[in-house]
Regions:
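Membrane-spanning alpha-helical segments of multipass transporters and channels
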Residues: 1-232
Length: 232
């Protein structure tokens, strides 16, 4: 289905829809890969509480250890996935387009990781955290603009809920990167308008993804600093 996607005047609606689904589910794959992070944080939490109580290290040291250790792993995972998938599927040629694609995939991984860490940090047990994470994931998935296009959402939903979904901005950035001013996809402008992705640029989506990552990272840091489920 996704091997060397069609282009040109012969490209029908399936050609565009296949591209949208490929981009959407690529992001979802990165987020689902962070599910193990929930149980990992809770498993490490007892050690962190003990060491913090002994003044061996504080929340910032723990936060940095998590962040810095995961950085090369996520970069490798995203690179391994994208460097093969991108040419095989025939997505838009050009190093700059691949660079944006890689960026959004990497930032989706980071957002997903810190989202999982944030959920785990406010949950008392693994079971509770694993019930929170799917609920948050479904929310950001639904308001990404794929299952229901943003202009087709109810007024009160479409006006502000999509702005709370980092998934939406990763998806929008990747769609614009693939569709915008692409002569090989004659109907691309119509699809951009139909999705409601016509008023924030690719670079704007990059900035918003960085902002969301910082928000989730800050929330996680504040949670490990001030919440202690083992406190007596």
């Amino acid at each position: 289905m996704y091997y060397q996607l069609d282009t040109g005047d012969d490209c029908d609606n399936n050609c565009y829809n296949n591209r949208l689904s490929l981009l959407y589910f690529s992001i979802l794959l990165m987020l689902m890969g962070q599910l193990d992070s929930v149980s990992n944080v809770i498993a490490d939490r007892l050690v962190y509480y003990r060491e913090r109580g002994a003044r061996a290290y504080g929340p910032m040291a723990y936060f940095l250890s998590v962040f810095l250790l995961q950085l090369p792993i996520l970069v490798f995972n995203v690179l391994f996935y994208t460097i093969g998938m991108y040419p095989l599927t025939g997505l838009r040629a050009g190093s700059s387009y691949y660079g944006y694609f890689f960026f959004f995939m990497l930032m989706s991984s980071y957002c997903g990781m810190f989202m999982a860490y944030s959920v785990a940090s406010i949950a008392k047990s693994t079971q509770v955290a694993l019930s929170y994470f799917p609920a948050v994931l479904v929310f950001v998935m639904f308001y990404a603009g794929y299952a229901v296009y943003i202009p087709e959402m109810d007024d009160w939903q479409g006006k502000w809920l999509p702005y709370l979904s980092f998934f939406r901005f990763a998806f929008q950035g990747m769609v614009l990167n693939e569709f915008q001013d692409n002569d090989d996809l004659p109907k691309s402008h119509d699809y951009i308008n139909k999705l409601g992705f016509d008023f924030i640029s690719v670079s704007g989506c990059c900035g918003i993804m960085i902002l969301f990552t910082c928000i989730f990272a800050s929330f996680f840091y504040l949670a490990i600093r001030y919440i202690d489920f083992e406190e007596r």
